[in-house]
């Protein structure tokens, strides 16, 4: 391995100081593909492991936090979605359900799956989930799709819980900082899965990471994490050169066997330069990036009726379960960012070791140039 650069220390930023971690690298929260094992592996290495808990009940979140704490004594983050549902989720009825199901029913039946029946939407409240995080005094609380209520942010501050809010535009970053959020995650449109736009529709908030990061760095005084399209040391160093004080990596960790991704999903992520991604509302009802496959293409066709989030997500699960059993990845929602073709590692610790070694050999001069005002 290359010897780390010593002047300046690239891994010493406000983010590492605030959290007491060794490296300014955050494992992206992977929603339903999160695992306690991956979260702990990243944290034990010296980064910030994250667990995406937005789809979990408060009781289940409490159990997840307890298990993570049996696996690591290091800081970790729990991630929630502030906006848990789209307009119409409560009023969408059986007729809309039947129309949306009609675009999937042929595949479900061909795979031997049972067609689901309509059931009214029963919400999980963000405030109830957040209460569990507050009571557990988690080290870091990250969130997307908006800003938590003031009383929640005030309690985080009082308890020393670091808050990390996602911004997909510079104006979102500004309002997050004005609300007292500690760290801004500047999430470019290259990112896999959901990005969490909240001031404007997601389709109007498609700035790329390496355009967004310097805009956000210039707009706020809070430390900025670069997220989206970063999968190797080159992306990390580029983010540091643009003023980021940390990076968030998703797809590269998703490809590791510690993640909750299926074998078919991980194989697709490791397929190399042939991998292509696209944006769709068809997988969940909210705009998100995944691997371009038959399912994504069919659900993006004109005339396909998409239910509001999270109803569409629940509907698609009725296809995903039999498709997984039948080894039909072309009919699975496969989350991935635009740099997923750079995924090379199947072991999270090996990925981290490679990133740290490669970044250490080149980041010092770049960071010094940036701290001295380079590029401005």
Spans of features found by a protein language model:
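Active-site entrance/lid segments in N-terminal catalytic domains of soluble metabolic enzymes
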Residues: 2-219, 355
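Conserved active-site-proximal phosphate/metal-binding subdomains
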Residues: 194-199, 203-225, 230-376
């Amino acid at each position: 391995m290359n010897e780390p650069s010593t002047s300046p220390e690239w891994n010493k930023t406000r983010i590492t100081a605030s959290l007491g971690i060794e490296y300014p690298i955050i494992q992206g929260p992977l929603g339903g593909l999160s695992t306690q094992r991956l979260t702990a592996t990243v944290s034990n290495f010296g980064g910030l492991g994250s667990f995406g808990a937005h789809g979990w009940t408060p009781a289940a979140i409490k159990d997840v936090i307890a298990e993570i704490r049996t696996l690591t004594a290091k800081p970790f983050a729990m991630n929630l979605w502030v906006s848990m549902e789209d307009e119409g989720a409560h009023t969408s009825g059986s007729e809309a359900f039947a129309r949306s199901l009609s675009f999937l029913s042929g595949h479900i039946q061909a795979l031997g799956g049972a067609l689901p029946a309509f059931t009214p939407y029963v919400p999980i409240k963000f405030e109830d989930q957040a209460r569990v995080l507050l009571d557990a005094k988690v080290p870091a609380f990250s969130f997307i799709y908006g800003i938590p209520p003031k009383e929640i942010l005030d309690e985080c501050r009082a308890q020393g819980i670091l808050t990390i809010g996602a911004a997909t535009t510079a104006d979102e970053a500004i309002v997050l900082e004005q609300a007292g959020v500690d760290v801004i995650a500047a999430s470019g449109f290259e990112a896999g899965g959901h990005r969490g736009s909240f001031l404007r529709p997601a389709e109007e908030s498609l700035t790329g990471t390496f355009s967004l990061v310097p805009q956000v760095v210039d707009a706020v005084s809070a430390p900025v994490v670069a997220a989206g399209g970063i999968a190797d040391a080159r992306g990390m160093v580029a983010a540091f050169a643009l003023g980021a004080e940390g990076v968030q990596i998703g797809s590269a960790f998703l490809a590791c066997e510690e993640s909750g991704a299926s074998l078919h999903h991980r194989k697709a992520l490791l397929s190399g330069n042939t991998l292509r991604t696209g944006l769709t509302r068809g997988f969940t009802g909210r705009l998100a990036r995944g691997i371009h496959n038959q399912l994504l293409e069919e659900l993006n066709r004109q005339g396909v009726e998409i239910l509001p989030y999270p109803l569409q997500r629940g509907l698609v699960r009725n296809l995903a379960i039999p498709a997984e059993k039948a080894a039909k990845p072309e009919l699975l929602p496969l989350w991935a960012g635009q740099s997923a073709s750079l995924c090379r590692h199947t072991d999270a610790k090996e990925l981290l070791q490679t990133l740290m070694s490669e970044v250490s050999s080149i980041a010092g001069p770049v960071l010094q140039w940036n701290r001295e005002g380079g590029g401005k």
